[in-house]
Amino acid sequence: MRDAANKQIEIPYLLKIGNGKTERVGKYLFDKRFLRIALYMGDGIVELIGGTLKAGLAECGIETVREHIAASVEIDEITHSAFSLPAVDAIVGVGGGKALDFAKYTAHLLRIPFISIPTAISNDGFGSSSASLTILGKRKSVKAASPFGIVIDLDVIKNSPDIFMYSGIGDMLSKITALDDWQAARDRGFERYVDFSAMMAYNSLDILFLKHSYNIRSESFQRSLASSLTVSGLAMEIAGSSRPASGSEHLISHALDEICEKPKMHGIQVGVATYTEINF
């Protein structure tokens, strides 16, 4: 990593959180002169919002050079797909973890802008510069593209199951122990600590938890959850690592992934691990 004084920080130039955003994706891309794109979507996304999304793209004259359903995150498949892709201005990922990881790693390989359009807010991965890929049969976290743009349509988010909301809350809770672990590592001289990044991570907690209402079905809460997860992703980009958002609670979750026949959602596991650590 370069010296902190010379570190280049990539932040989203395009950030839209609100209602009716899917139909405006075409306009957002046109405004940035991203006229040729590759579109990577998760299973079921075409049926969920595909019609609205494609209509908006066509209306603005955006050409979709490739449309791909990302059913896996095998690194060999992504690499082959990336280097067989005709020239495009941007990579657009729509859906959950697999689609976004497929898209952001493709953008990383080709060094072109990545637009992240999550259809659920179950963790902060949609705003981070890391991807969870399958390498030699095992899931590993690798460096990927930081989002040039993030578009979150609350009209889509509100239709996701409750478990996705709880997972997002759990992922946010994990910042509590992650930040404590980071400070402990700093105090023992093991790791570099970035004050501004830590402040951003603490602020991401404040956005969500300093609220008067915790009704997960309210638009206000969902907007706050989306915003806090976005800020958490930015905190990681500033730090140059996942330390502001990932600590020992994530190691517990990774262990559960290995030993459980049917692991739960990532945010659920890290949330439970955080609660256990706090009360240990």
Role assignments for model-derived ranges:
Residues D43-L48, G95-L100, S122, S242:
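Gly/Ser/Thr-rich loops at beta-strand to alpha-helix junctions
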Residues L109-L205:
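A glycine/threonine-rich phosphate-anchoring loop and its flanking beta-alpha core
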Residues A38, D89-V92, P113-I115, F148-I150, ...:
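Structural motif
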